[in-house]
């Protein structure tokens, strides 16, 4: 009689010991993100977080996002240290445009075979993003799923919850004719348009690691972490009458700005007010991409656009630039019933 082989979970492709090693590796960086409202530590079935006491009528704001196919480029180039920052940025920037202070963040990391070094690098980046935005990394899920992903490929998703005073929610309803639009400079393509980026790299035959652009490898431009605007914008909201904020993500200028405009208003963008960073000029030229498509796919150097009264512009620019942002007047709001909500001229 043939003796049956005793199988283990590891034989099936799931290494519990590797998962435990990862938890031990990241405990220190996660602890640095802790906020006073967080109750308990890592390892519970759920994370507990109290609401900050300063809010009279707190409203919770939630968001979830990923980093799209920027992740594929990062895996191809074996550069995992900033993807976590991208993940946090995509979530917390969406929250702050509504006036919300990010409270806590959770991540989901899924892979076919867990590489502790890679996962630790990614999660350390997530912790860094949480530090930059002032939110606590309270938990997450690391899923090793053999057969679901090729080799050591992985995917990440983020989930964030923030809080805003009910009377201070920013929803665009205050936007009016004559408001001025202020731009906040981006750090690069952020985390959008990377399927087109990768297609341009493929068609052009360009090696981003050896191609030099503005004194550094193209890969550095393409993988620059998404800028986190939370602390600068929260201070701005506290001191200036902000009417609306648009986070320029997928859909670029054409789709994101109208999301915060009331009916019968139009955003007029002054294209001469800034110069595209070199990476966008390279992408347009290498891919023969139309101007319209560039503004539809990429942020073209603008990470956020803020609408506020003209009387607030000087103070707003001074505050933002003092906090390390590259801020400038990029346009105005005009009364219009035109179907085209955004004009770039």
Swiss-Prot record:
It is an enzyme of class 6 (ligase). SUPFAM superfamilies: PurM C-terminal domain-like, PurM N-terminal domain-like. It is found in: Cytoplasm. It catalyses: 2-formamido-N(1)-(5-O-phospho-beta-D-ribosyl)acetamidine + ATP = 5-amino-1-(5-phospho-beta-D-ribosyl)imidazole + ADP + phosphate + H(+). Its main location: cytoplasm. It comes from the Bacteria. Keywords: ATP-binding, Cytoplasm, Ligase, Nucleotide-binding, Purine biosynthesis. Gene3D superfamilies: PurM-like C-terminal domain, PurM-like, N-terminal domain. GO terms for cellular component: cytosol. PANTHER family: TRIFUNCTIONAL PURINE BIOSYNTHETIC PROTEIN ADENOSINE-3, TRIFUNCTIONAL PURINE BIOSYNTHETIC PROTEIN ADENOSINE-3-RELATED. Belongs to the AIR synthase family. This is Phosphoribosylformylglycinamidine cyclo-ligase. It comes from Escherichia fergusonii (strain ATCC 35469 / DSM 13698 / CCUG 18766 / IAM 14443 / JCM 21226 / LMG 7866 / NBRC 102419 / NCTC 12128 / CDC 0568-73). The lineage of its organism: Bacteria, Pseudomonadati, Pseudomonadota, Gammaproteobacteria, Enterobacterales. The gene is purM.
């Amino acid at each position: 009689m043939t003796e049956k082989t005793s199988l283990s979970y590891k034989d099936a492709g799931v290494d519990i010991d590797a998962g435990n090693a990862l938890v031990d590796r990241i405990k220190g960086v996660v602890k640095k993100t802790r906020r006073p409202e967080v109750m308990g530590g890592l390892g519970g079935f759920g994370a507990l977080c109290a609401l900050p006491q300063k809010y009279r009528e707190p409203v919770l704001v939630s968001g979830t996002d990923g980093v799209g196919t920027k992740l594929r480029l990062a895996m191809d180039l074996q550069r995992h240290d900033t993807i976590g920052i991208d993940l946090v940025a995509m979530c917390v920037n969406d929250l702050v445009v509504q006036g919300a202070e990010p409270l806590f963040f959770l991540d989901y990391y899924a892979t076919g075979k867990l590489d502790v070094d890679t996962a630790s690098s990614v999660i350390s980046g997530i912790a860094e993003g949480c530090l930059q935005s002032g939110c606590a990394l309270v938990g997450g899920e690391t899923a090793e799923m053999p057969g679901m992903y090729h080799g050591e490929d992985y995917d990440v998703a983020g989930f964030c919850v923030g809080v805003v005073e009910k009377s201070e929610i920013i929803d665009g309803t205050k936007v009016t004719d004559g408001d001025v639009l202020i731009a906040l400079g981006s750090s690069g393509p952020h985390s959008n348009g990377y399927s087109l980026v990768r297609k341009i790299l493929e068609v052009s035959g360009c090696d981003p690691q050896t191609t030099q652009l503005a004194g550094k490898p193209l890969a550095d431009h393409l993988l620059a972490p998404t800028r986190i605007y939370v602390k600068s914008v929260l201070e701005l909201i506290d001191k200036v009458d902000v009417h609306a904020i648009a986070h320029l993500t997928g859909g670029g200028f054409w789709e994101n700005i109208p999301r915060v405009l009331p009916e019968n208003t139009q955003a007029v963008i002054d294209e001469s007010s800034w110069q595209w960073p070199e990476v966008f000029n390279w992408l347009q030229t290498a891919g023969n991409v139309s101007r319209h498509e560039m503004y539809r796919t990429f942020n073209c150097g603008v990470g956020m656009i803020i609408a506020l009264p003209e009387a607030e512009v000087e103070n707003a620019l001074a505050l933002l630039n003092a906090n390390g942002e590259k801020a400038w007047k990029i346009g105005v709001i005009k009364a219009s019933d035109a179907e085209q909500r955004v004009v770039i001229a």
